[in-house]
């Protein structure tokens, strides 16, 4: 696939939760699921093909790609060095987090220089939360935070409090950042009515848009916030290659990698979100 030559003067960023993307050698994490080398490299190449398709559509390969549910640098290398993506020269930033399952946030980047980066653990009542750390990466003219906040599934009151605590942490980071800050990630809940922060504003997607489908309902839990939302356009990349027919609720839904122990061969239960400005 060749990148089109149409004029493009903006910046493209992507965030994608790639659903439990573990190195196939991490046997203890995916025991019983037959997560083989073939399936691992097929998924890595599939992620690369999606980024290539977005590059073709936008006329420019994404400058920054935030990823959630990545387990190690080996997984990131499999993505950026795959035959479909290697020509773009992506590099990556990754830190081991405090998540008990070993899944972290990561960031791919190209054609830009990292000034500084760090992992910022979530804290609650003075203690580090056993969850994914916030990933802060600063470039010459832009700063990015990639996040994957505690899950809401199961109705855990503690998880809800931890998730709520993350919002002022993100706002505090924004308040001390001298550059335009983009926060992208899986917030594990939709924006709450009346939710306001001092330094960050929500980038609104099109109405009726969702990045996941849960019990037949579309939810926009993969979100973007910024210290300056002017000119930022946000869309969900609903690609045919990422979808399957929803036999239970009708319509379509993301084609995930596994449903329980059953291998489906998809890439994720989330669609990527794309930001342009």
Q: Where do the PLM segments sit?
A:
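Active-site-proximal beta-strand elements of phosphoester/diester hydrolases
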Residues: 12-22, 118-119, 141-151
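Active-site beta-strand/loop signature of hydrolases that rely on acidic residues for catalysis
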Residues: 13-18, 51-77, 108, 144, ...
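Active-site His/acidic residue clusters
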Residues: 28-32, 142-159
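Solvent-exposed, acidic/flexible segments
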Residues: 36-44, 69-73, 101, 127-130, ...
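Structured beta-strand-rich core segments of catalytic domains in phosphoester-bond hydrolases
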Residues: 70-141, 149
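Active-site environment of divalent metal-dependent phosphoester hydrolases
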Residues: 72-74, 100-102, 152-153, 188-194, ...
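Metal-dependent phosphoester-hydrolase catalytic domains
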Residues: 172-182, 188-277
């Amino acid at each position: 696939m060749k990148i089109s030559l149409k004029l493009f003067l903006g910046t493209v960023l992507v965030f994608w939760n790639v659903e439990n993307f573990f190195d196939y050698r991490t046997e203890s994490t995916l025991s019983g699921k037959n997560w083989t080398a073939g399936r691992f490299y097929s998924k890595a190449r599939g992620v690369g093909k999606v980024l290539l398709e977005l590059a073709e559509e936008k006329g420019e390969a994404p400058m920054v790609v935030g990823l959630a549910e990545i387990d190690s640098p080996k997984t990131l290398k499999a993505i950026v060095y795959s035959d479909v993506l290697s020509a773009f020269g992506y590099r990556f930033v990754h830190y081991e987090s405090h998540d008990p399952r070993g899944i972290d946030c990561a960031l791919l980047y190209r054609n830009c220089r990292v000034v500084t980066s760090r992992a910022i653990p979530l804290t609650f009542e003075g203690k580090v939360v056993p969850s994914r750390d916030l990933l802060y990466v600063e470039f010459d003219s832009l700063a990015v935070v990639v996040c994957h906040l505690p899950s809401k599934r199961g109705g855990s009151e503690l998880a809800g409090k931890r998730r709520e605590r993350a919002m002022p942490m993100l706002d505090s980071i924004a308040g001390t950042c001298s550059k335009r800050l983009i926060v992208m990630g899986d917030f594990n809940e939709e924006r709450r009515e009346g939710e306001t922060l001092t330094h960050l504003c929500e980038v609104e997607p099109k109405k009726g848009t969702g990045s996941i489908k849960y019990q037949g309902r579309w939810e926009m839990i993969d979100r973007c916030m910024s210290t300056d939302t002017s000119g930022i356009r946000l869309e969900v990349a609903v690609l045919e290659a990422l979808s399957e027919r929803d036999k239970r609720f009708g319509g379509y839904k993301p084609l995930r990698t596994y449903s329980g122990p059953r291998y489906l061969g998809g890439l994720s239960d989330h669609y990527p979100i794309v930001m342009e400005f």
